[in-house]
Structure formats: structure tokens, C-alpha cells
């Protein structure tokens, strides 16, 4: 497999993880995530020991959705965890975990930093996703872009500074709130993937 192929595969994983944080799983997305191709992808990903437990939870949840009610319950989990903004939720914004302030503000320093990164790459947050730029979904989508368009050193710096720096705190908050465990598994997989990617990108 060439380096181009490897980077493309890495980008696909980041895009997948980004999509799961960007919006709830609807009927069309469920079909995609449980298709034969997706099952092969999950199977391949689960072969890595650090990913196995999280991938198994994600697969069992998705494959276990057999009716609209179960799909709505997963959508309710997404809403309750990421959209409500209470102490019983885990808002996926870097600024809430990296700011030293007692009452960190949305659209703060991390948002401004991400907005500048996007601007430099001639990218922007899509209009149908009205969220601050330091939303985890935006950061993972940007990393997918970097995989195919930037030097390893740029990718490494972004992962260490902007993603890995707060993911563990986010997961700690998320696991306290996530009764069903699906999104905790997605977040834990994300952190494990980021850690592995950092190790691969670091110079020998």
C-alpha cells in the first residue's frame, strides 16, 4: 500500500468519526454504517487491540437497531449528550476543556484558532452545521483534509495541540453522562485512533 493510499485510508477514518459527532444517526446513515462494506471496515478496525472493545460496542449498537423506536432512542442520546448544554451533557467543544476560565465561552480562543486554520486551507464550516469551529466534528473533518494535503509535521502538531490536548477530559465527562455507551465508545475509539496516529507520525 502506497503512502497516498495509507493517507486516504486515514482520512476516511477521520471522516467517519467526524460524521458520528456531527449529527445523529438517521435511517440512511444507519444503512451505510451497517452495510456489508461497513461490516468489513469495522471488522478490520477491530483487529487492532486498542480499538476492539470500542468497535464491538459500536457495531453491536448499530446492528441491534431494528425499528424506528430504537433509532429514535439513539438520536435522543445524541441530543441529550451534545446539544442540550447542561451538567448532564458533554458538549464537544475544545474551548470548554482547554480554557482556564471558570465559565469558558463558546466562540472563544480555540474557535478563533480553528477558524484561522480553516481559512488558511480555504475551508469553512458548512452553513448547515451552525456550530463553533472548535466542535470535535469540525476538527476531525479538518484532520481528514490534512491527511491528504499536509506534511506529517503539520498533522502531528494539529493532533497534539488541538485534538489530543482535550479529548481525555471530554471522554471523562461523556462517560459520566452516556448511559447507553454508544457515544462513549465512539469517543474512546477516536482517542485511541488519535494516539496511534500520533505515534505513527512522530519522527523515528
Curated annotation (Swiss-Prot):
Q: What is its main location?
A: cytoplasm
Q: Name one GO biological process term.
A: protein complex oligomerization
> What subcellular compartments does it reside in?
Cytoplasm
Q: One GO cellular component from the entry?
A: cytoplasm
* Claim: Calcium is one of the keywords in the record: no
- PANTHER family registered for this protein in UniProt: CHAPERONE PROTEIN TORD, CHAPERONE PROTEIN YCDY
What is known about what this protein does? Involved in the biogenesis of TorA. Acts on TorA before the insertion of the molybdenum cofactor and, as a result, probably favors a conformation of the apoenzyme that is competent for acquiring the cofactor.
Q: What is this protein called?
A: Chaperone protein TorD
What high-level taxonomic lineage is stated for the organism? Bacteria, Pseudomonadati, Pseudomonadota, Gammaproteobacteria, Alteromonadales
